A protein has these predicted regions:
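Short beta-strand edge/turn micro-motifs at domain boundaries
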Residues: 14-76, 140-142, 172
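C-terminal structured domain segments
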Residues: 164-172
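Generic signature of intrinsically disordered, low-complexity segments enriched in small/polar residues
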Residues: 9, 35-38, 52, 80, ...
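Core segments of small alpha/beta cavity-forming domains
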Residues: 1, 48-121
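Surface-exposed, charged secondary-structure patches
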Residues: 1-19, 118-164
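Generic alpha-helical propensity signal that fires on short helical segments
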Residues: 50-55, 159-165
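Residue-identity detector for glutamine
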Residues: 15-16, 25, 30, 58, ...
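Detector for Asparagine
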Residues: 31, 83-86, 116, 128, ...
């Protein structure tokens, strides 16, 4: 324990993209609870999994025999989010929509901040122990983990910082 079940949703009638859902059961006598949700961007290729009576095996954060352990991969991806092309792990990961959209939004905000003499800072930090791993049919791992991000923006003197995206507008 804990045990995890991974599920992929269908595209909805209103064309909402597929989601990867992770349900976790912390002990034998507890119900499964939704633990994680990840939006599957267009073009995502999922690995194959064992479809049998027993299903795919659970992986661990310290699985070996891979390019890096799942925990190390999460730490490396957080470093890549933090440092972009300057990350020492940049060559280990293919380009992806999340980083592309984040880079575009960051550049857009930076341009506005420079015009009004503001500042911005982003940090990305993996959460220790917040990881679920499922073994794929080819011996790899599908890793879902929590990486907290904090984006601090300050407007120049006498100015106000506005939400930078539709998601931020919904929160404010």
């Amino acid at each position: 324990w804990p045990r995890s079940v991974f599920s992929i949703t269908s595209t909805t009638k209103d064309q909402q993209s597929k989601r990867l859902l992770v349900f976790r059961q912390d002990s034998a006598r507890q119900n499964y609870k939704l633990w994680g949700v990840a939006r599957l961007f267009s073009g995502v290729k999922m690995p194959s999994f064992e479809i049998s009576k027993t299903g795919s095996a659970q992986g661990t954060p310290t699985d070996t025999g891979l390019v890096m352990t799942p925990k190390a991969a999460v730490d490396a991806y957080a470093d890549l989010l933090q440092n972009g092309a300057n990350s020492k792990y940049a060559s280990k990961f293919a380009d992806d929509d999340l980083r592309s959209k984040l880079a575009d939004l960051t550049a857009q905000v930076q341009k506005a901040k420079e015009l009004n003499e503001g500042t911005q800072q982003q940090t990305f930090e993996p959460v220790n122990g917040a990881i679920s791993v499922m073994r794929s049919a080819d011996g790899g791992d599908l890793v879902v983990a929590q990486i907290n991000s904090e984006w601090t923006r300050s407007a120049g003197a006498g100015r106000e910082s506005q939400p930078a995206s539709d998601a931020e507008k919904a929160l404010f």
